[in-house]
Amino acid sequence: MALLVLVILFCLPIFLLFLLQKHRKNTRAKLPPGPPGLPLIGNLHQLDATNLAFCFWKLSKQYGPIFSLRLGFRPTIVISSAKLAKEAFKTHDLQFSSRPALSGTQKLSYNFLGLTLTPHYNSWREMKKKFVTHILSANRTEQFRQVQTEEIFRMIEKRFEDEGTAAVSRLHSVFAETQAMVGRVFFRDCLPFVGCWLDSLTGWNRRLRNNFSDCDKVYQQLIEDHLDPKRPKVAEQEDLIDVLLTEMKIADDHQTFDSIKSTIMENIAAMDTIKVTLEWAMTNLMKNPEAMKKVQKEVRYVVKDKGFVDEDDLPRLEYLKAVVKETLRFQPAAQFLPRETTERCVIDGYHIPAKTTVFVNVLAIGRDGQVWDKPDEFIPERFVGSNIDMGGQNFEFIPFGAGRRICTGLPIAMPIVELALANLLYKLDWTMPHGMEIDDLDYDANPGFTQHKKNPLRLAATKFI
């Protein structure tokens, strides 16, 4: 009898969910086309979790630039064209201003206390005001600019030192795991009742808890280091954590250590996208020797024998900027933009209900043969003399998003990428390590929200200047 009761208790919620799902299917308005799914799990079995963007891209070739999926009980649409991205982010920007509340992002952002991942538009708007006031102000930007320049020079010098310490390796593995957690849709995000059990059974709950614990220890140590009374206080060398701690002391809002940790997490993720972009840029240049020769010639001609590249040189480095843009088109750091509709709207004649998860496939848009000539080739020249930028107005090229939720740190991130790449190309000559050929370089990527190279780039560098 006890066993029978357990079976009934387990099966009853599943049966009720099946009836609810069937009712929704019969009463829904005209949705975009999409692959047929199975009861309860929908299309979950058809997705390749190791590379969602390519999986979505493949489905778009069969079902069109907008198609529907059902991830368990989570209604989902995928947009894969510049035209429909513009319709979503410009015509219906307010309706697409939220983000899906996923388990990984919720846990690792301390219940959405940071700016980037919060699904709540009003909270995001208030946090953005503070970010612009305290981080993007002219004085702060100039302070951070000096620190960034010093760090870039230090990074280049460390190429010739032994930095393969256990501590560095440990931090790298922790934050690589964070990217995997942030980019994952957990079972409990899609399947009420049984999803949490499945996450426990498959070990994803344990991985998320362990990663959160590892990250929290890192953030806590950073905060304690900044609170140490013996730490030198130099106003010109204040960093982001100093600014956040100062604001927590003087502000009358609810700034807490957890909110500071959430901001640290998001900024580490932002720095990670910069590192990823640099790695892909160098990969592309090594695979395309003529482009490498051309960009190094430009940088060294403009900078001459000054000894370093600074931000004042960047406006004259047109081909270098084209290399960065082409890299972001070819391998966008974030392959898709997650959104959630705040209310019902119509896209391309299809009805999109409120609370629908939306993935805008940046990778597919950047490889669209109807927009780009030879989209599968790395051709920086396509951006030379072009007015296309990444500020969210050219919807065929939106590596940092568009609309209200465009990446707030874009004005900081791009100069860092360009400055770092320019100095790497100016100061160093690059070759393949002994025993390796250029053909050994691949474009394989790890699963996760950010497109990390599966096989880290290994190059030999010799000092040019």
Question: Can you say where each PLM-predicted feature lies in the sequence?
Answer:
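C-terminal helix/juxtamembrane-tail motif
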Residues: A2-L4, F10-F15, T246, T357, ...
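Terminal signal-anchor or tail-anchor transmembrane helices
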Residues: M1-N26, P415
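Cytochrome P450 substrate-recognition site 1
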Residues: T27-V147, E151, A167-V194, F449
